[in-house]
Amino acid sequence: VKRSLAANAGVSMIIRGIDEDKLLNDKDAMPSDPPEYLYDNNLFNDVNYIFNKDTWLIPLRYNLQYMRENHASTSFDNYSSWSVKATFSKKRTLSQYERPQKQEEAAYTQEIHDSIQANIDQNIVATVRDNPDVAFYYFLPPSSICQWDEWNQKGVLKIQIEAERMMIESLLAYSNVRIYGFSDRFDMITDLDNYMDKEHFSDEINDKIIDWIHQDAGRLTKDNYIQYINAISQFYTSYDYEEIFNG
């Protein structure tokens, strides 16, 4: 987001889903070893991308397959969509979920608190603070009940919910951001037919999220965010997670 804003002076609105599972990460954690040449300002080392065989061969393979199947050109809305070939079902979701062994509940220490806050400040709040003329629409997506089971199994469920509270509270200090929470869509979240794995949901849910934001439904404010946190805490700390695997 920060780089997009730096490279595009005319951007006036950002819509961003917050990956909840990243809130407990170290502030400088990276999901993999990223190619730095894609993110620096050196044009010359971009040859590493331009002349990379995967850059040419992988898209070529998919484009040829697309042509052989006589598909029409894609629109902006579906050119990068993978949902057409995805399977959304409880069976598929559970087949992709490796349930961790049950661990004792982790202690919430000052060190953990400080690490979470540093992550929130650096990777979420800073961009909002530094761009007061940009309207930010941030949302917590309705991750499946398998995701919540994973946090419960790892003993970090309560810490996860506290991290979400901290993030919401930090963002509410700024007038140029609206934050929406959809972790309380319990009927949707417990219906694994909406998912292909613990995190990825169908495009129908994507559409609903955009509609909810447009309607200002699920918006969290200083007046209601504690009620939201209490509701998800009550639900996920008392849920019978063994039900997921029965039937």
Cite the ranges covered by each PLM segment.
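Extracytoplasmic/secreted proteins, especially bacterial periplasmic and envelope-associated proteins
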Residues: T55, N119-N123, E162, M166, ...
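Low-complexity, serine/threonine/proline-enriched polar segments
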Residues: Y39-N78
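Short secondary-structure boundary/capping segments
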Residues: D28-P35, N152-V156, Y195-M196
